[in-house]
Every structure is written in C-alpha cells, then in structure tokens.
Design a protein with these regions (language model features):
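Buried, small/hydrophobic-residue-enriched core segments of structured protein domains
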Residues: 2-41, 51-53, 88, 92-106, ...
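Gly/Ser/Thr/Ala-enriched C-terminal appendages of enzymes
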Residues: 2-41, 45, 50, 54-59, ...
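N-terminal, Lys/Arg-enriched amphipathic/low-complexity engagement segments
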Residues: 36-99
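Short amphipathic alpha-helical segments
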Residues: 63-66, 147, 452, 456
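Short coil/turn segments at secondary-structure boundaries
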Residues: 82-83, 150-154, 170, 472-478
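Short active-site oxyanion
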Residues: 277, 305-306
Length: 506
C-alpha cells in the first residue's frame, strides 16, 4: 500500500451512503486485487440459498428492485474515500473509486418469483471491484426482503389457498427503521393489505397503505370510554374503528360501540358510510371473544361491523382459531411474528464466486469445496430454467451452463441434484420451459421494466394459486421441489471437486 499521511477520520452518525454498507474485508480484498493488477478482471458470482425458511417447500424471492436501484446509483463520496484511506486502503485504489460507476450485468429472478434451494436467485457479472464490494448490501437486501415476503405468504394464507385479511403491525418491533420500511413493503407483496408504517406508504406509495385507529392510551386519556369513542367518531365519521378491550370488552366496550353506532345512524340517517366500520380486540381469548362479539352485534342488526384481532399472532395461532375454534374474525393485525419472521428469523442466502472471465473470453469455473455435499458450490456461469407440466405447474428447475438452451417439447436428460435421490439420472419432458434468470441490468444500464407493487403482489398470488404444486405448499413435510443439473454442469462440478478435493462428491 502507498505510504501516505492520512488525517484521522471524523465520525458522522447522520452520514449515509448505501455503497458503504459493506463488510470491511470486501474493501481489503478489492484493494489487494487492485494493487496486483486485477481491477479489470471480470468475476461471476451467484446468490442462492440452501434451505427454505420454516421448513417450507418454497420461498419468495424479493428485493430485486431495491438492488437494481442501488446498483444504478452506486458511487463513492469524498467522505467515503477519506475513511478508506484512514482504514489503510491504497491511494490509487481510492482514486479509482472516486469516479467508479457500476457497469456490470445483473441477472435475477423477477421480484416475487417462487424460488427453491440451490437455484440462483441473482447472478452478478462485473469487474472485480463491482463484483466484490456489493456482496454485503446484496445479501442484506435479498435475504431480508425474501424472508419477510415468504413469511407473509404464510400469515396471509396465500400459501394454503385460504387467504385472510392481514395488516402488518410490526414497525415498532422491527430491528430498526429500515427493517420496518422494507419489511412493510415485502409483507404487502406477500399478501398483507396494509401496514401501520406511515413512512412505508410515503416511500412506496398507496399500494402500501398506512392503516390504524387508536391505542389504549387514547381511550384512557378521556374521562370515559364513551367520550373517547364519540371524539374519534366526530373526527373520522367515515372511518370509525374502535378498540374494545381497554376496560372490559363485554361490559363496557361492546355496549358503548353499539350506542355510538346508534347515535351515528340517528345523526346521519341517509349516509350509510358514516357508521362504525370495525372493532378490535387485543387481549383475552380472541377466538371465543370474536364469536361472542359477532353474535351480540348480529343480534342488534349490526352485521356490517367487522371484527379485527391482534396480540402476538402468527399463522399457526390464526389457523388454529379458525379451524378448531370457529373464530369469527374478519381481519388481523400481525406484528413481531411477521416483521421479524420469529419462527425462522434468518434467510440463509449466500454469494459465491462461480467463474472468472479469461482473456480469451471464456469462463474458468471456480468452486469452494466442502466435505458436505450440500455446501459444494455449483461452479460455472450458470442459467436457471423452470419446467412446467401439462397442468401449468412447476415440475422442476434446471441449472444449466449459460450457453445451454431449452425449448418447449424438448426431452432433457438431467442429473438430480438431491444426493438422496434413488436414481440420479432423470429424463424430463419440457412441456413448457421458461428461462427464469432474466437480465435486469446489462453493462450498467437498466434493460427491464420494473412492475409496480400491485403487479408484483398479483404475480406472487397467481404463482401460489396456479403454478406451484399443492404438495409443495403443505405447512408440514412439504414435497421437495426437484432441482436438476444438466450433464455439463454436473460434469464440471464433479471435475472441479475431484481436482480440488481428490475424490468424488459424496
């Protein structure tokens, strides 16, 4: 490294540049390779994961749009360079970063695509600096968004074809503001109808609507519960939704809400929109309470008042209340169990070097070895395909070399990636086949139209309803989706493993 005098770096806790959301060793590696003359060497990395969260049969890939915007705006500031000099990076490297723009290629699954273990979700091909330095942000973005979108499909009932109305209420329990915002976005894609987070709607628009009514503190502030109800109805006569369990649901909350609704009917007899829209319960036996509330409200002709429930709910509690207890709940507010994916809080996506472009334009495969077959990397510049059967459902995914092609009607001879498969050699009829790893950025330029949030939400719903086998959607012991390698990929993997490890993949 160049021996120069560096002034101490002055911290600034308000400073923010996403390009610096990077593990320090990324800079250490990139600086070293730069100093050894590899700045123009093109590397290929794949981002994939090894296990579905919550032992599911699938996951939802999410975060691609945020990643695209990050790469298109990738840059370093003088403050960044001063810090990197302070941390020991070379002056030449920092000067190179001063004008650096990301000019690589990004191939990825479309945001919202159902995905499976080992199949590449993202493929990066870029010069050394642009391939290495983006790893941390890429993984943070893709892992968290995919985790929450997947969890939301369970909580919203999309995955079991039993959709329920769910609002994302987890902002205050999220691990920081960015998790609250990104989590709200991913939850909406996964089937939620709204979020408690105002900034999320400001950032992403009306398809991520902020919703909510009152807290217990609002009710407690007034001399009586009825005073609180009346004040709220006076302020928002077309959006009256009230919390019933501040004092006593059935001795206080219910009688008062019935009385208030009668007052609204008397005051606005010709405006049916000015009525109590819903009531929420946040404690006690929610299933039993909802049934009792429904019966009482229906008995006085108020079947239009919806019942909302919240209180540390998740997909299992909701399903049990619906299936075994006959709960009469119209909508749910779900907080920490969704925004943290509490039952499985880590999406294990990894970012691995799989090829380096040589001077003659060909690609040299790269592979990390492991005694565990599940961690033996699939080397080479790869492409991902999905084969659909005659019913339009995903039959298997194929991992091929980038220059291999498949078309409808092909008979593909493949190698089953599952090490426990009885017969590793399979023959697949490609009734319909789609290339699922598609270009998003080429040579630093956006080459794909990014759909809006509603379109992505509908895309996820359509896949889970029509393009995924029900056996893969089972909550317990789901069918394992078939992932196959082309013989060329399998041979490359075997040859690399034998060369580096001295034996066959076991």
């Amino acid at each position: 490294m160049t021996n120069i005098k560096v002034e101490p770096y002055l911290p600034d806790e308000d400073y923010d540049n996403p390009a610096m959301v990077t593990d320090f060793y990324e800079f250490s590696m990139a600086n070293c390779l730069f100093m050894h003359g590899y700045k123009d060497t093109v590397m290929v990395f794949n981002m994939f994961y090894r296990d579905n969260p919550d032992d599911l049969g699938y996951a939802i890939s999410c975060g691609q749009d945020k990643l695209v915007k990050f790469l298109l705006n990738y840059h370093f500031t003088d403050r960044d360079l001063k810090y990197l000099l302070y941390k020991g990076m070379s002056e030449e490297f920092c000067e190179y970063l001063r004008t650096y723009k990301w000019k690589g290629n990004l191939y990825a699954l479309r945001e919202g695509t159902v995905c499976y273990p080992q199949v590449p979700m993202v493929r990066i091909e870029c010069d050394m600096v642009g391939a290495i330095l983006i790893e941390t942000y890429l993984l943070q973005t893709m892992n968290f968004h995919s985790l929450i979108a997947t969890k939301a499909t369970k909580i919203s009932g999309l995955s079991t074809h039993t959709p329920r109305s769910v609002m994302e209420f987890g902002t205050r329990r999220a691990q920081g503001a960015s998790a609250g915002n990104d989590g709200a976005y991913a939850a909406i894609l996964g089937g939620c109808i709204g979020t408690a987070n105002c900034l999320a709607e400001m950032k992403f628009g009306p398809d991520v609507p902020a919703v909510g009514t009152v807290a217990h503190s609002f009710i407690e502030f007034f001399p009586t519960e009825m005073d609180a109800f009346r004040a709220y109805a006076e302020s928002y006569p077309t959006h009256v939704s009230l919390l019933l369990d501040t004092y006593n649901i059935f001795e206080s909350g219910l009688p008062n809400v019935i009385k208030l609704d009668d007052e609204l009917i008397a005051k606005y007899p010709n405006d049916p929109n000015k009525r109590v829209k819903s009531v929420r319960i946040d404690s006690g036996d929610l299933a039993r309470g909802s049934k009792k509330l429904r019966k009482a409200l229906d008995a006085v002709g108020k079947n239009y008042i919806k019942i909302v429930a919240s209180n540390s709910l998740d997909e299992n509690k909701m399903a049990d209340m619906e299936r075994y207890e006959g709960a009469r709940i119209d909508s749910y507010g779900v907080g920490e169990k969704l925004i943290t994916s509490a039952t499985d809080p880590v999406f294990g996506g990894v970012y691995k070097l799989v090829a380096v472009k040589k001077e003659d334009g060909t690609y040299e495969p790269k592979m990390k070895c492991s005694d565990s077959v599940s961690k033996a990397i699939i080397p080479g510049k790869l492409m991902a395909w999905r084969v659909f059967d005659s019913e339009g459902k995903g039959q298997c995914d194929i991992i091929s070399l980038d220059n291999e092609e498949f078309k409808d009607g092909d008979i593909a001879n493949l190698i089953n990636l599952d090490p426990d498969a009885f017969d590793p050699v399979v023959k697949v009829e490609c009734t319909h086949v789609e290339r699922i790893l598609v270009p998003h950025i080429i040579n630093g330029e956006l080459v794909i139209d990014l759909p809006d949030i509603r379109a992505k939400k509908d895309y996820i719903k359509e896949q889970l309803e029509n393009r995924v086998w029900e056996s893969e959607l089972r909550p317990q012991m789901p069918h394992k989706h078939y992932v196959d390698l082309t013989p060329a990929v399998a041979d490359c993997r075997e040859e690399m493993y034998r060369k580096l490890h001295g034996g066959r993949i076991k």
